Each structure stands twice: as structure tokens, then as C-alpha cells.
Amino acid sequence: MSETENRQPKNIKNNPKIMKAWAVYDWANSVYSLVITSTIFPIYYSILTTAYEKKEYVAETKTWIDVPVRHMIRIFGEEYQPDAVYGYSLTISFFVVVLLSPFLSSLADTIGNKKSFLQFFCYLGATSCMGLAMFTGMHNVFLGLLFSITASVGFWGSLVFYNSFLPDIATPDRQDALSARGYVYGYIGSVVLVVICLVLIQVFAKGAAQQLLFTRISFLLTGAWWFGFSQYTFKHLPQFGDVKDKLPKDLVLLNYKNIFKRHEEQGGFFEVFKDNLSFYKDIAKESFHELFKVGGELFKDKNLKFFLSSFFFYSVGMQTIFLMATLFGKSEINLAQDKLIGTLLVIQIEAIIEPLFSQDYPRELVIKMLFQLPSSFGLWLVFGLIS
């Protein structure tokens, strides 16, 4: 019996402890979605990139309103609005995840260490959230954007491997309920931390300077929350598979403890990497070949093709709203901070209800609705909104 088999529980599927550990990761990482993506960080970014507010008279209402005047961010000699640069930075993070996911997923399947990749992206995201506390103004705005990018890569990259565990730990009849459980954990956990952060910022902070300080502390709390609660997941989630014989004996990604020893023997890290370059090339070639093969198979089914197409437009639209709504509300509409966060909290709390009931729907009915409604209604809705 292999070492891997020894360290794995005998009953992996539908094991209550393992399923709970999987769901707890949603509790851990969902704070990024609410604190960093949707509420506190976008408002903080908008405040730090606003030069001043000027008074403008509105003749219709015969009132004076405060209009923010934004700093401009210079990139390669051109000036850009801070909100646009923020959107571009998130786009970069998604491109990184899209490019890395097929290769890393294939590599993880080959060497059987999905949990290690999940840990890597989790720690990347958590430390990046804490790194955002170093963003204090326009003088280091690129540092803030860099940590925003790496936090996004960590979050979305970890979800690739997190979601791939679902069919490994639960049978099909339990997967919907477990997925819903994860969503509920995530929604509740993120609301709890946001409330804690808001109490710090709005109640304990005295004056604008302290509010900014406690906001940065909120970023530290977000990273610590993500890192800390994920340890329960990593403790109980099994590492599937074992290292296969076809792998290079001293593969850097596996035998990282021997890197320094080989560094002395062979004259450098890059020499070690070059020894295994053919392995990485084979993995990359196989991963993208499999990606296009699966894509071709999916689009052979008419219903599935329409569903994926409509879901793509739906997902793009919703993600754009989630990522940019707060900045738009703060910078363009000049909504008050408490109204912005209050609205998002109401939406988050309302979202807890749906997963609690959706797991009880007949599975066949849900699948039928997913395949028929988006394909017929989703595209028309998208086209209607565009027009």
C-alpha cells in the first residue's frame, strides 16, 4: 500500500468531516469577494484616488452638491482614470487565471496534488489581501493595484482546484446539497467579517485618519480570516493520488526541499529547471489539447451549447456589476458610503436564502430549467440590454 493510500481516509466520498472541511473553505475565502471586491476596498481605493471635492450648483433642485475630482494615473506616458485602471488590473488577473488554469489543473491531475495547488493560491490571495494595507495613497497606487491583481489571482485560481474536489468527495446525489452548504457558509462568513470591519471603521474610528487606518486593518483581518479558517480545510481534505513513475526523479515542483542541494551540485536553479523542461512542455501540450477536446465535445450538444453561450454572457455581465458597481456608485453617482455597503449587505443576506431551498428542488427539474431557460431567455435578455 502506498504512502498516499495510508494517509487517506478509507471512506472519502460522503465523509461528513471531509465534506464539512470542503464547505468551510467557502467560509474562509468568501470574505475576499465581499470585503475586497465589493465593499470596503473599492470605496477605499476611490477615496485615495480622489484629489478633492468641488461644489457644483444644480439649477433643477437649486442645491449645491459635492463632485469628486479624481487623480489621473499615468501609464507609459498616457493618463487614465483610476476606475478604468482598476478595471484593467482585474482583467489582467483573469487573463492570468485563464492562462494558468489548464496547465496547472493538468499538472495537479498528473501528480495528484490538487490540495497543494489549492493551498498555494489560497496563501497567495490571503497574503495579497494583507498586502493591500500597505496601499496608502497615490504615491504607491501601483503597489495597491499589484496586490489587487495577485489577490484576485489567488481567489479565482484557488476556486479552480476547490471546485474540482466536489466530485471526488461527494456522490452525485449529495453534490447539490454540499455545494449549497458551501454557498451558505460563504455568505454568512463574509457578512460576519464585513460587520466586524464596519464596526471598527464606523464606531471605533475617530476622524478620517483613523477610519483609513481601521480600513487597512480590515484588509489584514480579511487575509488572516482567509488564511486561518482554510487551515481546517487543509487539515481534513485528502490529497488524492500518488506521484506517478513517469515523473522526473527530481522534479522541482515536487522535491522543493532538494532544490538547494541540486543548486550546489548542478550550478543553479535554472539548470535544475531545464532538466525537467520537457516534462513541463508535455504537460502544457496535453492540458491544452484536453481543453480543446472537451470544448469540442461540449459544443456538439445543442442544448449545452446554448446554455454555455448564454451563461457566458450572463456571467460576464454579472461579474462586471459585482466588480465595478461600488466604484461606479462612489465615483460617478457619489452615493454615501453607508448606503453602498448597506445595499450590498442586504443583497448578501438575501442570497443566503436561495441555497437553503435550492438543494431541495428535484434535480431533474433544475437541470431542465438550466438548459431551457437560459438558452431561450438569457440571450434575448442580453441582446435587449445591449440594444
Question: For each predicted feature, which ranges?
Answer:
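Juxtamembrane intracellular "pre-TM" segments in multi-pass secondary transporters
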Residues: 2-19, 238-308
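Short amphipathic helix-loop junctions that connect adjacent transmembrane helices
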Residues: 36-84, 320-342
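Transmembrane alpha-helical segments of major facilitator superfamily
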Residues: 86-97, 342-351
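C-terminal ends and interior cores of transmembrane alpha-helices
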Residues: 98, 119-139, 376-387
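Helix-to-loop junctions at the C-terminal end of transmembrane segments
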Residues: 99-113, 353-368
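Glycine-rich segments within core transmembrane alpha-helices of 12-TM secondary carriers
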Residues: 179-201
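C-terminal membrane-cytosol helix-exit motif in multi-pass small-molecule transporters
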Residues: 193-205, 223-243
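A single, central transmembrane helix in multi-pass transporters
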Residues: 274, 290, 294-353
